[in-house]
A protein has these predicted regions:
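Structural preference for beta-rich elements and adjacent junctions enriched in aromatics
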Residues: 1-126
């Protein structure tokens, strides 16, 4: 498991700003190199920067890939079938975790997973 320090900032981050903009240049970069075992051997280069202001957290992903797919457009649709990134946040003292997934078009899927035990219908409790 990778650990990453999320820098605290004074106010909301501009998520429309460029990767190297003043808003983001001081945020630590983490290289994402964990891929699901059932994925193909094709692994694009992925980096992420994150920040928080005490009220929310903000992230930018940078993906370098020559093959992309972007079909899902509805909130909470199956973006995992598209070119996507995902990350997980475990709240302190809480049960479970938040699962965020974004496709390359910006469509988001978000679940709060209380029990990640796999069943034939997905997770046991989400």
């Amino acid at each position: 498991m990778n650990c990453y320090h999320v820098k605290k900032i004074a106010g909301p981050a501009d998520i429309a700003a460029d990767w190297n903009s003043a808003d983001w240049k001081d945020a630590e970069i983490i290289k994402i190199n964990n891929f699901r075992p059932e994925s193909s051997n094709h692994h694009p280069e992925v980096e992420c920067r994150m920040q928080h202001d005490g009220k929310g957290f903000y992230g930018l992903f940078q993906v370098k890939d020559k093959y992309i797919r972007c079909v899902a457009t509805e909130y909470n649709s199956s973006v995992c079938r598209d070119s996507c990134v995902e990350f997980f946040v475990e709240p302190p003292g809480g049960q479970g975790y938040l699962n965020f997934e974004f496709n390359c078009g910006g469509t988001m899927l978000l679940f709060y997973v209380k029990d990640c035990t796999r069943t034939d219908k997905g997770f046991k409790d989400f």
